[in-house]
């Protein structure tokens, strides 16, 4: 159909979780120790993926890898970093990262009836659509209660409008 699947790496999710621990320690009910552990984990994970990030940056085929602190900074313009339900601010930051790298169509899949992701994902669609009017975002629920035909039709509709 002409589309490409792009998703965050698993390491990005771990980095998000580490940053949440740090935020919780500074602003919510987290302990100093959990905040320190989160900061240490984030730095260690960023250091671990540094060779990968440098190699990808040199590549002509792949987009460069953003540091999670940069993703958080951009996301904080639209959603508070204290939003830690589901994927919280990471989902918004990830969509913005895709948009800034040239994506004009985004499918936000909501798996297994995950209410927190449903709220944070669909809740940000209107805000991001207003900020980026040339981008189309479709939130599609993928769970046993959803119609497979409806899911496929919504995806095909988004793909059909991709080249207009």
Predicted stretch roles:
Residues 1-164:
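An N-terminal assembly and electron-transfer interface module characteristic of large anaerobic redox
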């Amino acid at each position: 159909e002409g589309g490409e699947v792009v998703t965050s790496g698993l390491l990005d999710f771990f980095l998000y979780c580490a940053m949440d621990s740090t935020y919780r320690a500074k602003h919510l009910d987290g302990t100093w120790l959990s905040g320190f552990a989160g900061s240490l984990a984030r730095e260690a994970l960023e250091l671990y993926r540094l060779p990968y990030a440098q190699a990808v940056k040199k590549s002509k085929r792949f987009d460069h890898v953003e540091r999670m602190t940069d993703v958080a900074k951009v996301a904080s313009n639209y959603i508070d970093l204290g939003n830690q339900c589901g994927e919280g601010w990471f989902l918004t930051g990830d969509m913005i990262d895709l948009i800034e790298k040239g994506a004009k169509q985004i499918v936000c899949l909501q798996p297994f009836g995950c209410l927190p992701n449903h709220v944070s994902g669909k809740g940000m669609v209107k805000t991001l659509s207003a900020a980026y009017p040339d981008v189309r975002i479709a939130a599609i629920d993928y769970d046993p209660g959803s119609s497979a035909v409806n899911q496929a039709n919504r995806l095909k509709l988004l793909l059909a409008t991709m080249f207009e």
